[in-house]
Amino acid sequence: MQRMIQQFAAEYTSKTSSTQDPSQPNSTKNQSLPKASPVTTSPTAATTQNPVLSKLLMADQDSPLDLTVRKSQSEPSEQDGVLDLSTKKSPCASSTSLSHSPGCSSTQGNGRPGRPSQYRPDGLRSGDGVPPRSLQDGTREGFGHSTSLKVPLARSLQISEELLSRNQLSTAASLGPSGLQNHGQHLILSREASWAKPHYEFSLSRMKFRGNGALSNISDLPFLAENSAFPKMAHQTKQDGKRDMSHSSPVDLKIPQVRGMDLSWESRTGDQYSYSSLVMGSQTESALSKKLRAILPKQNRKSMLDAGPDSWGSDAEQSTSGQPYPTSDQEGDPGSKQPRKKRGRYRQYNSEILEEAISVVMSGKMSVSKAQSIYGIPHSTLEYKVKERLGTLKNPPKKKMKLMRSEGPDVSVKIELDPQGEAAQSANESKTE
């Protein structure tokens, strides 16, 4: 965009002012044009030769038309508050003598008033290696003096290390042998790497770096060194206090343990039945309380733990009181040595709820899908149980058929002991099969 504007300005001035000298110095972008000549360095000549261009310049002084050879010389003066990090050298970087070029003198005129110590050829203010007043002033003189900035920085860091080593020895003598050991370790760390040093060491060197020249000797910095060592002493006393607290007495920590099943629930099987009685407010368990205990608290983790021993206790009841009919589950078999643990979400239902759902479906009160939505039993499991009881399975298991035949004469005795009518109805249906 700048190039187009410059070309337009060059063409306009070449058409209007044909009396200008074409051999006048021009920018590198407009050298291809033979008759191109931008605005001259003297504004009086531009106003006398080209009144239209003078009006444009008076209307907008910051426009790209104002980029001339004169402005390119004083270009660093416009970047007073900007830190130039480019690798190119400014026109005044090569001049190291006291007499500067006009471009360099304009930077000091437009910027902040510099001190006479800044015009020294080595860029230093005192003999101990203190850098210029600020980093911005150092870059304003050019990157030719960048090598002189690195050595004073190392020198200032060395000064801060010497001051801190003196204060460490004095504080270590007051703290005792443990303090000597701690301070010695910290001193080794501070000498090994720059990243291992605390923040206040660099702040001390930065204060020395950005000082106004009054702090030129080590003897001028005892107060600052003491202040810089004070937060270190406070930090170390805080750490020592924490160590004493850690070594004083063991603290009771609650460590979370991952456990699948609490074995203490097995010894308290009687408490499982009193759990629902506390919830329902009655001492005896009814069929409704068992149903609510198995269906409703599925979301709670405590009820998840209750589901395992609860079903085991109900299976133990069934094995002691006797089963009116065999089931396909291994849990219901009295000959099984140990009841099988429930696996997955499809075994989170209770066996009593399963029996009630099977009896409701077999009596014709509900369909399989309706019983699935109400009792929370999977459709395939409920359908298989119903077909197994009705004898409509295509491939009935041979082992279950043998158990049914062996338990056939004992069913009549078990019916009298069973108080539920649903179990009696299902037992009669199994006898008819």
UniProtKB/Swiss-Prot annotation:
Motif Nuclear localization signal, residue range(s) on this chain: 339-345
Keywords: Activator, DNA-binding, Isopeptide bond, Nucleus, Phosphoprotein, Repressor, Transcription, Transcription regulation, Ubl conjugation
Motif range (Interaction with nuclear receptors): 53-57
Tissue expression pattern: Detected in heart and kidney.
Cellular component, GO annotation: nucleus
A GO term for molecular function: DNA binding
Gene3D superfamilies for this protein: Homeodomain-like
Record domain HTH psq-type: where: 340-392
Membrane-traversing stretches: none
Extent of the signal sequence: none
Biological process annotations from GO: negative regulation of transcription by RNA polymerase II; regulation of transcription by RNA polymerase II; transcription by RNA polymerase II; transcription initiation-coupled chromatin remodeling
Function: Repressor of ligand-dependent transcription activation by various nuclear repressors. Repressor of ligand-dependent transcription activation by ESR1, ESR2, NR3C1, PGR, RARA, RARB, RARG, RXRA and VDR. May act as transcription activator that binds DNA elements with the sequence 5'-CCCTATCGATCGATCTCTACCT-3'.
Subunit structure of this chain's protein: Interacts with ESR1 and ESR2 in the presence of estradiol. Interacts with CTBP1, HDAC3 and HDAC6. Component of a large corepressor complex that contains about 20 proteins, including CTBP1, CTBP2, HDAC1 and HDAC2.
Protein name: Ligand-dependent corepressor
Organism: Mus musculus (Mouse)
Lineage per the UniProt record: Eukaryota, Metazoa, Chordata, Craniata, Vertebrata
